[in-house]
């Protein structure tokens, strides 16, 4: 199979979905234990953190203004880089302010990426194939989440990996995936 066969917009959507889901699922599944065990969060701080996580969702409309400056596909890459960096550095900031900042960066990347991914999907896919491919993207995200949860469980249960190392590996894989897709796909 030649690389040219793999270089299409659907595969770009698939790979970006995997990268996003891997990073976000890692962040979500480790967060509650990390903030309690390492940052000594109470319910109050967890509530503030979750509220901060939703702020970029409210600001997703600003995508329109950002797209006046850069192309959508490039913005998708930038958003995934923000997500990857936010996840990668989360473990190094076990304080309220540090976690609030890393959460905002991660969440901004996540919300902007999801907004742009939906837009790109609807532009790139024909009306006949859109329902099937969008369904496959959702299924791929679910499968990626399950695989991520399994590897996190194995890495902590059998190998005693720290929260920090898991966050770093997950964020790094996201960043490598973005680099790969940026360099090899349309």
Spans of features found by a protein language model:
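Glycine-rich segments within core transmembrane alpha-helices of 12-TM secondary carriers
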Residues: 135-150
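C-terminal ends and interior cores of transmembrane alpha-helices
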Residues: 81-94
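Helix-loop boundary and gating motifs at the non-cytosolic
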Residues: 8-53, 57
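Transmembrane alpha-helix termini and helix-breaking/packing motifs in multi-pass membrane transporters
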Residues: 64-69, 147-162
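Helix-loop junctions at membrane interfaces in 12-TM secondary transporters
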Residues: 92-102
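Conserved small/polar residues in nucleotide/adenosyl-binding loops
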Residues: 181-186
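Intracellular juxtamembrane helix-capping segments at the cytosolic ends
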Residues: 112-125
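Symmetry-related core transmembrane helices of the 12-TM Major Facilitator Superfamily/SLC fold
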Residues: 165-179
């Amino acid at each position: 199979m030649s690389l040219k066969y793999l270089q299409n917009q659907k595969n770009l959507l698939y790979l970006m979905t995997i990268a996003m889901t891997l990073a976000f699922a890692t962040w979500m599944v480790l967060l509650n234990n990390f903030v309690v065990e390492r940052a000594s969060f109470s319910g109050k701080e967890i509530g503030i953190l979750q509220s901060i996580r939703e702020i970029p969702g409210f600001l997703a409309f600003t995508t329109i203004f950002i797209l006046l400056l850069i192309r959508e596909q490039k913005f998708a890459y930038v958003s995934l880089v923000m997500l990857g960096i936010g996840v990668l550095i989360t473990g190094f900031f076990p304080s309220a302010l540090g976690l609030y900042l890393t959460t905002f960066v991660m969440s901004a990347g996540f919300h902007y990426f999801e907004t742009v991914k939906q837009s790109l999907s609807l532009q790139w896919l024909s009306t006949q194939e859109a329902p099937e491919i969008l369904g496959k993207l959702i299924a791929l995200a679910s499968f990626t989440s399950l695989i991520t949860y399994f590897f996190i469980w194995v890495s902590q249960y059998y190998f005693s990996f720290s929260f920090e190392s898991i966050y770093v590996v997950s964020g790094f894989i996201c960043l490598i995936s973005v680099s790969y897709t940026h360099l090899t796909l349309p």
